[in-house]
């Protein structure tokens, strides 16, 4: 059974617990196997890089590290509030498509 994560790349999320509680950012990467996400501006770490063809000098770089997906909540684009996600089926021609919807205002997210 595949590991599912409730957010997708490009979603705006808010961190709901931990050191970065209340911070808002965009999802840069989703790691479904680890159940983690990388959020822009959250969990910044310094990484020591050895000299290589890309960086002949080497050095210390700062980048975002993954956090647990359960620690973030999707921000609804319409109401602008952190919300849980529900699913709906919408009719497209003869086929039904499953879409995400805001639990607070009912707006379809994607």
Swiss-Prot record:
Gene3D superfamilies: 2.30.30.30. One of its GO terms (biological process) is translation. It comes from the Bacteria. The keyword Plastid does not apply. Keywords: Ribonucleoprotein, Ribosomal protein, RNA-binding, rRNA-binding. InterPro entries: KOW (IPR005824), Rib_uL2_dom2 (IPR014722), Ribosomal_uL24 (IPR003256), Ribosomal_uL24_CS (IPR005825), Ribosomal_uL24_KOW (IPR041988), Translation_prot_SH3-like_sf (IPR008991). Disulfide bonds: none annotated. GO terms for molecular function: rRNA binding; structural constituent of ribosome. Pfam families: KOW, ribosomal_L24. GO terms for cellular component: ribonucleoprotein complex; ribosome. HAMAP family: Ribosomal_uL24_B (MF_01326_B). Part of the 50S ribosomal subunit. Belongs to the universal ribosomal protein uL24 family. One of two assembly initiator proteins, it binds directly to the 5'-end of the 23S rRNA, where it nucleates assembly of the 50S subunit. One of the proteins that surrounds the polypeptide exit tunnel on the outside of the subunit. This is Large ribosomal subunit protein uL24. It comes from Caldicellulosiruptor bescii (strain ATCC BAA-1888 / DSM 6725 / KCTC 15123 / Z-1320). The gene is rplX.
């Amino acid at each position: 059974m595949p590991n599912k994560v409730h957010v997708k790349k490009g979603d705006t999320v808010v961190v709901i617990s931990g050191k970065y509680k209340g911070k808002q950012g965009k999802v840069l990467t989703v790691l479904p196997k680890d159940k983690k996400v990388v959020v822009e501006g959250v969990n910044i770490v310094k990484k020591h890089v050895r000299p290589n063809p890309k960086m002949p000098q080497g050095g210390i770089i700062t980048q975002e590290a993954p956090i647990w997906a359960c620690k973030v909540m999707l921000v609804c684009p319409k109401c602008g509030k952190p919300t849980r996600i529900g699913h709906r089926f919408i009719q497209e021609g003869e086929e039904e498509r499953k879409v995400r919807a805001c639990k607070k205002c009912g707006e379809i997210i994607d």
